């Protein structure tokens, strides 16, 4: 059975990391994703790289550094996201630790926002427990 005819639950390929920034991405993987672009996310704690199919190159990264996590933090965060029109995240870490620091991070397409970024950032800055808000464009 050739690799092209196998239709199981996963597909794997060994990648070689060289001095340059290029990685050979198999055509069969690209075809399976159904798009010619993707969002690559490195999850530090797991040392795991995930790739998500994209319709557009427009992606924003949102990071919240959390000092003290309250019981209703995620409920309030969800309400802020809903008011801002942020209902379809490309990827979210949930609340996670990196060393002794606590974060919530996500990636999203900015076209879904029903409010501007300034309003979203202001709402997040006053959320109990949030020490720092970072919103930035993800580079191609």
Question: Which residues does each predicted region cover?
Answer:
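Charge-rich, low-complexity segments
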Residues: 1-32
């Amino acid at each position: 059975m050739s690799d092209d005819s196998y239709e199981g639950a996963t597909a794997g390929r060994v990648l070689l990391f060289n001095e340059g920034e290029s990685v050979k991405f198999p055509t069969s993987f690209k075809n399976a994703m159904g798009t010619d672009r993707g969002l690559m996310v490195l999850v530090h704690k797991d040392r795991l790289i995930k790739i998500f199919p994209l319709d557009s190159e427009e992606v924003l990264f949102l990071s919240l550094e959390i000092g003290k996590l309250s019981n209703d933090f995620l409920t309030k965060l969800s309400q802020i996201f809903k008011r801002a029109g942020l209902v379809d995240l490309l990827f979210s870490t949930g609340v996670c630790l990196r060393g002794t620091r606590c974060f919530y991070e996500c990636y999203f397409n900015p076209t879904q926002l029903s409010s501007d970024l300034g309003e979203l950032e202001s709402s997040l800055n006053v959320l109990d427990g949030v020490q720092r808000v970072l919103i930035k464009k993800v580079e191609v």
